C-alpha cells in the first residue's frame, strides 16, 4: 500500500535558518512524519533576506534529501505557471501551506487548488491572525485575507 502524500509549501526551508521558528517547526514536523507519509516540499533556493542561492542544493528540480523530496525554486521560477506545473505533475492527498501572507507559497497554490474538489488543504497561520499581528501592515494583510476567501 502506498503512503499518503503530503505537499508542503514554505517560503524558506533547510538549509536556511534566518527565517527562524517556521523552518524548524516544519523540519520537526517532517522528521516526525516522513516514515509514515510521502512528503514533498516546495520552497525558495535562498535563505530569508538573501539573494544568493544555497551553494549545496540544485535549483528548479526535485531532489531527495533525508528521505523527502524538495524543490528549491529560483527567483525566476517563482510564478503561477511553475507552481501550477509542480502541483499538477503528481497527485497529493494533503496540501500544507505554512503561513498565509505569501504570494507564491500560499495565495497562488490556493488559486490553483480551488477547483480541485476533495483536496485537503491545511493552512498553518502560525500566529499571523492575532490582533497584534493583524494591526501591522493592516491593509496588505486585509487584502491577502480577502483573496484567500476568494480562493475557496
Listing of model-derived features with the role each one plays in the protein:
Residues 120, 130-152:
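Nucleotide-sugar donor phosphate/pyrophosphate-binding loop at the beta->alpha transition
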Residues 18, 51-52, 82, 105-108, ...:
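Short glycine-/acidic-enriched loop or helix-start segments at secondary-structure transitions
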Residues 55, 70-84:
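Glycine-rich, highly charged phosphate/nucleotide-binding loops
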Residues 77-81, 107, 147-150:
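Structural motif corresponding to alpha-helix initiation and N-cap regions
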Residues 17-19, 70-75, 134-142:
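Short, flexible loop segments at the rims of nucleotide/cofactor-binding pockets, characterized by
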Residues 1-56, 61-64, 90, 148-151:
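N-terminal subdomain of nucleotide-sugar transferases
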Residues 85-105, 109, 118-122:
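Short N-terminal targeting/anchoring amphipathic segment
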Amino acid at each position: 500500500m502506498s503512503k499518503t502524500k503530503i505537499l508542503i509549501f514554505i517560503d524558506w526551508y533547510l538549509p536556511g535558518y534566518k527565517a527562524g521558528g517556521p523552518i524548524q517547526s516544519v523540519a520537526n514536523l517532517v522528521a516526525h512524519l516522513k516514515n509514515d507519509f510521502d512528503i514533498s516540499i516546495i520552497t525558495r533556493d535562498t535563505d530569508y533576506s538573501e539573494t544568493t542561492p544555497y551553494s549545496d542544493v540544485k535549483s528548479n528540480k526535485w531532489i531527495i534529501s533525508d528521505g523527502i523530496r524538495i524543490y528549491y525554486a529560483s527567483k525566476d521560477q517563482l510564478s503561477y505557471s511553475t507552481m501550477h506545473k509542480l502541483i499538477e505533475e503528481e497527485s497529493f492527498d494533503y496540501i500544507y501551506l505554512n503561513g498565509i501572507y505569501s504570494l507564491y507559497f500560499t495565495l497562488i497554490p490556493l488559486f490553483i487548488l480551488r477547483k480541485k474538489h476533495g483536496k485537503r488543504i491545511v493552512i498553518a497561520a502560525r500566529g499571523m491572525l492575532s490582533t497584534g499581528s493583524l494591526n501591522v501592515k493592516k491593509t496588505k494583510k486585509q487584502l491577502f485575507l480577502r483573496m484567500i476567501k476568494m480562493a475557496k
